[in-house]
A protein has these predicted regions:
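Conserved small/polar residues in nucleotide/adenosyl-binding loops
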Residues: 178-180
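Short, electropositive alpha-helical surface patch
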Residues: 103-128
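Catalytic beta/alpha-barrel core
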Residues: 135, 147-154, 169-176
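Conserved radical SAM core fold
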Residues: 55-60, 136-145
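Active-site-adjacent beta->alpha loops and helix N-cap segments on the catalytic face
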Residues: 89, 141-162, 166
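Residues at the N-termini of beta-strands
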Residues: 48, 130-131
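Non-membrane alpha-helical structural segments and their capping/turn regions in soluble enzymes
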Residues: 82-86, 112, 116, 149-156
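N-terminal capping/small domains of soluble enzymes
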Residues: 2-103, 108-109
């Protein structure tokens, strides 16, 4: 390298058919919808934004306190607060058309049908979405509040139903089954 000239490494990664400019992604729930704090980071320098969860209907989430600091870190229980899929499509998708970074939409549901309906709505309107992260750590109301990710058969059924709806990247957000 000559003095005064810097060479940037190629950090591109490929997942499925999508090529991301780098492996730096913001995780779902940590960065809102990716547009809330432009003064903090130029989102176009990120590999991807994984949005906060989207549900069929808007949700207020859990009452405060939602975040608690502990000596070992932080615990959060947001409760999937979000604007709902219709408002998301109306308000957020047009904003993403002006970004160069990839958008991964996190989808949450209470049963298989809700996940299917949300993905069908997204697929019918959006060309700016690179893929989906399917939040299966949500309680499955039709199974008595059990989380999808604890039931391998339900996880398989959900994955199969969603895979046929899209050719985009499909990421299953698994929950930890390890008890410490």
């Amino acid at each position: 390298m000559k003095r005064g000239i810097s060479v940037l490494a190629n950090l591109k990664i490929t997942m499925g058919s999508e090529v991301f400019q780098n492996p730096i992604w913001v995780a779902s729930g940590t960065f809102g919808y990716g547009t809330e704090a432009p003064e903090l980071v130029d989102v176009n320098r990120l590999g991807a934004i994984v949005t906060k969860s989207i549900t069929r209907k808007p949700r207020e989430g859990n009452p405060p306190p939602r975040i608690v600091e502990t000596p070992s870190g932080m615990i959060n229980s947001i409760g999937l607060a979000n604007i709902g899929v219709k408002k998301y499509i109306q308000d957020m998708l047009p904003v993403y058309e002006n970004l160069t970074t990839k958008i991964i939409v996190n989808i949450a549901g209470t049963d298989v049908q809700e996940y299917v309906e949300i993905m069908e709505m997204m697929e019918s309107v959006s060309s700016v979405i690179a893929g989906y992260e399917i939040n299966i750590s949500c309680p499955n109301v039709k199974k008595g509040g059990m989380e999808f990710g604890v039931d391998c058969d339900m996880t398989e059924k959900l994955t199969e139903k969603l895979r046929v709806l899209t050719e985009r990247l499909l990421i299953m957000k698994l929950l930890s089954l390890i008890h410490i």
